[in-house]
A protein has these predicted regions:
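Active-site cores that bind ATP or allylic diphosphates and position pyrophosphate for catalysis
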Residues: 59, 64-169
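N-terminal Rossmann-like or analogous alpha/beta NTP/dinucleotide-binding catalytic cores
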Residues: 1-72, 151-168
Length: 169
């Protein structure tokens, strides 16, 4: 069992215990120690530093207001060499085609740079993005298959790409 709680300001009091009670009510028991992502922030920071050493991430000072309705980041800060402190950290989305097969939704492909752009791994306020945390934790936990709702399907390409950058199988 993993509690994905990196976005601490959005956590409702008591939600963790409610989740665990629901799991138990359905007859499931954790087979290992419960992982709380909020306790692993240093690990995610280390991965960001690893990507920084490889020149695969950069600091970004653009705000949501500056980006407006454009959902694909144009790379405005990509070559500015801004300091990492108090900035968002983005991964460089290369011009690659990422494909996967979903058992229910079929084959999906995205041209990363054009359809997803450079996406955030860490917000300006220090909160680690879901994409990074789950990729690192899935790898460390040996998770190879993920069941997700159709509303989260568009996260898959980002996660595959991050796994490739980190040389995860």
């Amino acid at each position: 069992v993993r509690i994905e709680d990196t976005d601490i300001p959005r956590i409702y009091p008591g939600s963790e215990s409610h989740i665990l009670r629901c799991i138990e009510a359905f007859g499931f028991q954790p087979d290992a120690e419960i992982i709380f992502q909020k306790d692993r922030l240093d690990l995610y920071e280390d991965v960001i530093q690893q990507l920084h050493q490889l020149k695969l991430v950069y600091a970004c000072q653009c705000t949501r207001k500056m980006l407006g309705s454009n959902h694909i980041y144009a790379g405005t800060c990509r070559d500015l060499a801004l300091p990492f402190e108090q900035q968002a950290i983005r991964v460089k989305g290369e011009d690659v085609n990422i494909c996967f097969d979903d058992a229910l939704q079929g084959r999906h492909c995205s041209q990363l740079a054009h359809e997803l752009g450079d996406f955030v791994l860490k917000r300006r306020d220090g909160i680690i993005n879901y994409q990074l945390a789950v990729v690192v934790d899935d790898y460390l936990q040996g998770i190879t298959h993920v069941v997700r709702g159709a509303d989260l399907l568009d996260n898959t390409e980002r996660q595959i790409y991050l796994g490739q950058l980190l040389d995860y199988p």
